[in-house]
Amino acid sequence: MQLPSSLVSVAESAVQNAQEAGYLQSWPNEVVEQFHYVSALSQFITETIHRDEALAQQLPTMLSELSRHQAYRTRLAALLAECPDEMSGHRVLRQFRNREMVYIAWKDFLHAWTLEESLRHLSQLAEAMIFETYQWQYKICCAEWGTPTNAEGEAQPMLIIGMGKLGGGELNFSSDIDLIFTYPENGETQGARRSIANAQFFTRLGQRIIKALDQQTFDGFCYRVDMRLRPFGESGPLVMSYAALEDYYQEQGRDWERYAMIKARVMGCEMYPQYQELRKMLRPFVFRRYIDFSAIQSLRRMKSMISSEVRRRGLTNNIKLGAGGIREIEFIAQVFQLIRGGREPSLRNRGLLETLSGIEELALLTPQEVSNLEAAYKYLRQLENLLQAMADKQTQTLPDCDIERLKLATAMQLESWDLLIEQTQQHMNKVHQVFETLIGDDEEDEGSTIARHFHELWDMANKQDVLELILEQDIQVEEPAIFSKAIINFKADLAKKTLGPRGREVLNRLMPKVFDAVFAHPDAQFGLPRVLHLLHNICTRTTYLELLDEHPAALVQLVRLCTASPMISEQLSRYPILLDELIDPQQLYNPIPLDSYRTELRDFLARIPEDDMEQQMEALRQFKQICILRIAAADIAGVLPVMKVSDHLTYLAEAIVEAVVSQAWLQVSEKYGEPTHVKDREGKGFAVIGYGKVGGWELGYNSDLDIVFMHDCPVNVYTDGKKEIDGRQFYLRLAQRIIHIFSTRTASGILYEVDTRLRPSGASGLLVSPTDAFDDYQHQDAWTWEHQALVRARMIYGDEPLAIAFHNTRHDVLCKPRDEQTLKKEVVEMREKMRDHLGGKKSGRFMIKQDVGGITDIEFLAQYLVLNYSHEKPKLTRWCDNVRIYETLIAQGVMEEDQAMQLIRAYTAMRNEIHHRNLLNLDADVVEDKFVAEREWVKQAWNQWFA
């Protein structure tokens, strides 16, 4: 256990800390020596012991035990049984996990056991924690909602299927756990005052189990729980019955799900007689009775996707996903399992090393190849475990830092980093050699077959019966008649267009590629008509056809985005200049950073002469469309959550407002000069106040801009141009010009719909308010609903003096003491008036914004609470957006955390729905039974506060 000199100081520092903490003195010398060694290698071990006094005392005894894994479940069950509440249970789980992980890491770093023993301990620890958490929560849920039963009244358990390395008993040190929840039969609970359906019971139970294991607390977390391998992924139900599970795998199960199901294992399966039924049900899906060579192609496609991901994410030195890494060894084993497992019982093992033994017995690989794979697997898995145990981080990427490299080489008992890299590369090269021989790329034949089918689809586009045959037999689509009709109509419409020889030649080259891309997508029924509509619009512009023909990546992105969103499809059809943005997917899916919109827009406009107002207006619209395309693409790809989508849309709007004000100022000042009061100061003496969605950082894709204009021009000030006018008249002309720039329809459409009716006195008031008049109006004449609007108002453009003036007015007005009952009455009356005017008129539909329990109720409640309590708690005026207003209401003690968090969750869920309905060009109304729980939360809060 010799440490390199560079690591001795790390160890001595850890030992000194341990001595000062007082726990080292009670340890035997052997344990102290071991600690000196492992503390230099693992920050996780050192920090966990230092944080946990009980662990420090128990550690020597723990280290002397050789079979701790055999008692994981009984010890954890006893600890959980003593927990009086959920919080204490969560603490027990996290402490138990961390203590046992220190034990495992300690043994790993000392090489005190084999890799197989280490993986067994890690897997059995995870299984114990999952199963005992389930047992603990099952009892609590039964006490709350009754025991779930079938039609015969028999109690129903929930079975938890461990997938991946957990299922295979080969879990790595800092691994996620992939789970699927299922239960035998439908029915309802018995023994409680009110029965609920088994599906509802098990969904609630599943949510509690995930929370108990996954939630980050003061003590950390147990495991990241990943439920995405369940049927239908994230969009599917959290828990399914056996019958629903069987239907899914028989009718919709995909190749990768077969691949994943090989290692599936029920946690605590010996406790369930129902386990065998589940096993029998799943086996035919995983292992086919015939020899199934299609598995090679499926795994090849999966490997290709992984390779692309490695390139995209720049994952160099990745021992799992890189060429010859752990994943390739797993693929080699699983290709034989999928091809021959239906006939060969020795290939049905979950563990990889046992499967390799079966492969050798059946002489499917040479003994030398199997030996190389086994050696590489053991080496790479040990390297992975030690790498993760250094800081309890989920990583398979070798470190860049010299000291971390030295630690890892030392942990692997190698003299230098260079030696570690050399050995790692030798193992990975041998693996990749076997992988390439067995699964390597074989794209050419398949590619030409696919191309032939799609050439035929285009060449025969006037023969419906032939088209349907190709669609049904070769491409294997459902409802081929619908697709064939769309293709025939498209080709007939093209005949009426004036395409030159070059255009027709490009189109004939392009169309088979289009079909290839469209039918590779699972939602081709949406993608095909949208893509054909776009091509119909651009077919006379050969440049754009050539762009798609010469850039396969652009074509793939076009199909993906059109399939996902009719809004984007329509935008690309209307403004084909945006097709250029599809060439670089990396840029397409990475919106401009929030703080860069202003500078990016300035750079974008800099290429156009300042005095070319028409081109400047066109460029503004193009910039907006490019940015919205990138934001929407990132939204569809799941890169941006709803709050971030709104942030991007809002920062984009603010950048455009700044540019529009600058353009308008240039045009108006060129004619009249500038007001003299701004000559000796920075800025324009002008401000734009954003209300509503732009004020609250909550813009959607189709949002208008609610804005109010202000200036600080004194009376009797004039402009200094050849054509002198009153300063206040100048600001009126400026505002009119701004509105003109926003609303003029150019070749690229309008910029934004602008609404200025929230200004003092509404449509009959001055278009631009002097700051003092704005202040007077808000204090003396404004209605309560105007003060509500002020809650969501902030300056989105303007000089510092105006920012201070607006802030002071807003703060003072919102902090005015108000009669609570009068305020309640006025807010409720305004809400009812809005609902009567704007609420849903469709039977069986819920209007997300305006109906009872919707977004507007949440907004009105936030506004009421700010107006009612700000005189006592002025910090409530700090934010303009609803989420942070509710967070401030918690912080200021106005609203209970549970209630506020429910309202935040309801608000974000409903906004998310509206965002995605915008992408689909759908109205903001949904079926009546959607958001039932969220609407109930909102109604309860509304009734409580407005009682």
From Swiss-Prot:
<dbReference type="Pfam" id="PF08335">
    <property type="entry name" value="GlnD_UR_UTase"/>
</dbReference>
<protein>
    <recommendedName>
        <fullName>Bifunctional glutamine synthetase adenylyltransferase/adenylyl-removing enzyme</fullName>
        <ecNumber>2.7.7.89</ecNumber>
        <ecNumber>2.7.7.42</ecNumber>
    </recommendedName>
</protein>
<dbReference type="GO" id="GO:0000287">
    <property type="term" value="F:magnesium ion binding"/>
</dbReference>
<dbReference type="GO" id="GO:0005829">
    <property type="term" value="C:cytosol"/>
</dbReference>
<dbReference type="InterPro" id="IPR013546">
    <property type="entry name" value="PII_UdlTrfase/GS_AdlTrfase"/>
</dbReference>
<dbReference type="GO" id="GO:0005524">
    <property type="term" value="F:ATP binding"/>
</dbReference>
<dbReference type="GO" id="GO:0000820">
    <property type="term" value="P:regulation of glutamine family amino acid metabolic process"/>
</dbReference>
<feature type="region of interest" description="Adenylyl transferase">
    <location>
        <begin position="451"/>
        <end position="947"/>
    </location>
</feature>
<keyword id="KW-0067">ATP-binding</keyword>
<keyword id="KW-0808">Transferase</keyword>
<keyword id="KW-0460">Magnesium</keyword>
<dbReference type="InterPro" id="IPR005190">
    <property type="entry name" value="GlnE_rpt_dom"/>
</dbReference>
<keyword id="KW-0547">Nucleotide-binding</keyword>
<feature type="region of interest" description="Adenylyl removase">
    <location>
        <begin position="1"/>
        <end position="443"/>
    </location>
</feature>
<keyword id="KW-0511">Multifunctional enzyme</keyword>
<comment type="function">
    <text>Involved in the regulation of glutamine synthetase GlnA, a key enzyme in the process to assimilate ammonia. When cellular nitrogen levels are high, the C-terminal adenylyl transferase (AT) inactivates GlnA by covalent transfer of an adenylyl group from ATP to specific tyrosine residue of GlnA, thus reducing its activity. Conversely, when nitrogen levels are low, the N-terminal adenylyl removase (AR) activates GlnA by removing the adenylyl group by phosphorolysis, increasing its activity.</text>
</comment>
<dbReference type="GO" id="GO:0047388">
    <property type="term" value="F:[glutamine synthetase]-adenylyl-L-tyrosine phosphorylase activity"/>
</dbReference>
<comment type="similarity">
    <text>Belongs to the GlnE family.</text>
</comment>
<dbReference type="InterPro" id="IPR043519">
    <property type="entry name" value="NT_sf"/>
</dbReference>
<dbReference type="InterPro" id="IPR023057">
    <property type="entry name" value="GlnE"/>
</dbReference>
<keyword id="KW-0548">Nucleotidyltransferase</keyword>
<dbReference type="GO" id="GO:0008882">
    <property type="term" value="F:[glutamate-ammonia-ligase] adenylyltransferase activity"/>
</dbReference>
<dbReference type="Pfam" id="PF03710">
    <property type="entry name" value="GlnE"/>
</dbReference>
